[in-house]
């Protein structure tokens, strides 16, 4: 499944739901599951459906694997009913283009952003006149991100007022469905719900200043909408996270291509590292770091306000955002 969080306009305002993509439609999984339970004669079917498939993705993941099984049942049930079907109460099950808005698929508990692409790291530290140390190859390393500074597919991204050099970073990220501690690499993927696209925005001039004083990323990455996730979470029965082709476009022009083959540490090693001596939780997001040539810094080409950034990952979809606002005066 391709799991999404979406909103629908109603007379009482925006209502947020969990869904799954079916061609150009979004299936309301809770509504479909409630109808399924009703047909089976379950008392209080809508209430039970809301309990098992809640409107919040992190809460949904916390009910894994029961919630996943319910979602799969609902998805199959809805497809059998057809895209024009309405529930006995008149509720829509399918939403077509323009009838709903995709949001970030989840509001993560936290984001750990790893750096496992060798060429990207080499280029990043080359800007500082340094070489990649042997120590980098011993274990995957990460920095924490502001999980509250979040945006989703289609959102306009405001150019931060304090930077001259805004940069995107094309990454993929695993979304966790189970919690645990000291997880071995051989068991790691059993804890994963799926994979999504992650854009880690960076203010490069500010980042350079922070590096000069020996500080980790601060305001260079910590601003509203600085983390973009979407368009969906693809469950692992539909995709191999270690075999994903990525295409970067700016205003429709292809700027770069990449592949998860460039990762020097595996997803399993990332999870093993993240959980070492530390409990991880459903709704945690672990990102790969930028694909090789997946940012302006490496490409030597810089974006401007008004440009649209498209990050396509085969098997996942396209994460598209436009930059609005202006550079500081």
Spans of features found by a protein language model:
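A short acidic, often aromatic-flanked loop/helix-cap motif at beta-alpha or helix-coil junctions
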Residues: 34-36, 329
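Catalytic Cys-His active-site segments of thiol-dependent hydrolases/isopeptidases
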Residues: 26-33
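Short beta-strand segments in beta-sandwich/barrel cores
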Residues: 26, 180-181, 321
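A short, polar/proline- and glycine-enriched secondary-structure boundary/capping micro-motif
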Residues: 37-43, 267-269
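Active-site microenvironments in enzyme catalytic cores
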Residues: 1-12, 21, 32, 42-254
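Short N-terminal binding/cap micro-motifs at the start of the first secondary-structure element
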Residues: 11-18, 28, 320
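Catalytic-pocket segment enriched in acidic/His residues
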Residues: 14, 69, 95, 202-329
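Surface-exposed flexible segments
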Residues: 17-25, 300-301
